[in-house]
Amino acid sequence: MSSLVSRCQVIALLVLFFFGVCLAGKDIPANFVFGDSLVEVGNNNYLATLAKANNFPNGIDFGSPTGRFTNGRTIVDIIYQALGSDELTPPYLAPTTRGPLILNGANYAPGGSGPLNSPGSTNLDSWSPEQLKAMMFGVNYLAPVFFKKMDGQTIAISSLSTLSRAANLYRQILAKEVAKAIAQDTTTDLPKASHGVSSSSVKEELRPKETYFCDFYGRPIVYPILTSARRVTWARKINYDINNM
């Protein structure tokens, strides 16, 4: 509670300061920004990180990506221009942000900011097989149980329902596209029976080996290592199993 009060006091002081500057008819002499992806303007473009906003639809209102994790201006850009500035605060790491230009302000915020020089680094190697299985098979069970235990979270439950529908639609579309792509090369990959080889032995070649996974509750899920002749059938089976978990 005390930390919340302190934050409100800081925000109130900043609002009063900027309001006083505007009433006095003075321009803000400089604007220095610290934060994360909410206010970043392109510092990550100059860092060795995967967290970059240098592709569409980011920056679509500018006509091209600017390094902002948004379609247009950040909240700091909007406030700064509303206070009378004609320019946007440049990223500190940009090669052009040098010399006297820094005296007018600079943006030091990187997306995914943290104590390291490379923000947003991946940590897939640190995940255990159990965590990966939970993400693959257990989310559909775990999420409703989690939200049902939270009293009064109707908004969260509504959002969960929307996400569930979107996830189901994505799985259906993905399964159709996979089945369509696999069906195109099925006829070319089928082994042909030669003289002296019975059709039963060819079918034996097509029999896939099995590999075992467990869902979030430890129940075995058996999926074969697919050969071309069975890919379409098992693509449909995987989609059916996931939708009915």
Curated annotation (Swiss-Prot):
<keyword id="KW-0443">Lipid metabolism</keyword>
<dbReference type="InterPro" id="IPR036514">
    <property type="entry name" value="SGNH_hydro_sf"/>
</dbReference>
<keyword id="KW-0964">Secreted</keyword>
<protein>
    <recommendedName>
        <fullName>GDSL esterase/lipase At4g16220</fullName>
        <ecNumber>3.1.1.-</ecNumber>
    </recommendedName>
</protein>
<dbReference type="GO" id="GO:0016042">
    <property type="term" value="P:lipid catabolic process"/>
</dbReference>
<dbReference type="InterPro" id="IPR051238">
    <property type="entry name" value="GDSL_esterase/lipase"/>
</dbReference>
<feature type="signal peptide">
    <location>
        <begin position="1"/>
        <end position="24"/>
    </location>
</feature>
<feature type="active site" description="Nucleophile">
    <location>
        <position position="37"/>
    </location>
</feature>
<keyword id="KW-0378">Hydrolase</keyword>
<comment type="similarity">
    <text>Belongs to the 'GDSL' lipolytic enzyme family.</text>
</comment>
<dbReference type="GO" id="GO:0005576">
    <property type="term" value="C:extracellular region"/>
</dbReference>
<keyword id="KW-0442">Lipid degradation</keyword>
<keyword id="KW-0732">Signal</keyword>
<dbReference type="GO" id="GO:0016787">
    <property type="term" value="F:hydrolase activity"/>
</dbReference>
